């Protein structure tokens, strides 16, 4: 397993543990306690911030905001009973497919 996958797996494990924590002491638990809509709102906010950073052209801000987006995406995946390995497996499945072929496979065409 690559170091990148290791850090994603380790972070996902910590986030899963924090999901069960006291919402008064854990940001992750607080988000889960508020429900999926609150998590999705936060993912949307972070996605917007990443887009704005990219538009601004500051590489360090793009990386910083993308890290926030990935962090909150991992929380979303957890809320949906999924994890980074599921997403990585899907990316591996798609690797080598053209976008047109991948879309056709999804649509059963």
UniProtKB/Swiss-Prot annotation:
Recorded catalytic activity of this chain's protein: 1-(5-phospho-beta-D-ribosyl)-ATP + H2O = 1-(5-phospho-beta-D-ribosyl)-5'-AMP + diphosphate + H(+)
Organism phylogeny: Bacteria, Pseudomonadati, Pseudomonadota, Gammaproteobacteria, Chromatiales
Protein family per UniProt: Belongs to the PRA-PH family.
HAMAP family attached to this UniProt entry: HisE (MF_01020)
GO MF annotation terms: ATP binding; phosphoribosyl-ATP diphosphatase activity
Keywords from the UniProt entry: Amino-acid biosynthesis, ATP-binding, Cytoplasm, Histidine biosynthesis, Hydrolase, Nucleotide-binding
Intracellular or extracellular location(s): Cytoplasm
Annotated Pfam families: PRA-PH
A Gene Ontology BP annotation from the UniProt entry: L-histidine biosynthetic process
GO cellular component: cytoplasm
Pathway per the UniProt entry: Amino-acid biosynthesis; L-histidine biosynthesis; L-histidine from 5-phospho-alpha-D-ribose 1-diphosphate: step 2/9
EC numbers, comma separated: 3.6.1.31
Entry protein name: Phosphoribosyl-ATP pyrophosphatase
């Amino acid at each position: 397993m690559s170091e990148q996958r290791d850090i994603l797996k380790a972070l996902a494990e910590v986030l899963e543990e924090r999901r069960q924590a006291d919402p008064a002491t854990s940001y992750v638990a607080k988000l889960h306690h508020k429900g999926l809509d609150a998590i999705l709102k936060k993912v949307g906010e972070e996605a917007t911030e990443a887009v704005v950073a990219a538009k601004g052209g500051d590489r360090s801000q793009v990386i910083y905001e993308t890290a926030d987006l990935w962090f909150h995406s991992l929380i979303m995946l957890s809320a949906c009973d999924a994890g980074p390995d599921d997403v990585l497996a899907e990316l591996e499945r798609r690797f080598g497919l053209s976008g047109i072929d991948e879309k056709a496979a999804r649509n059963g065409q």
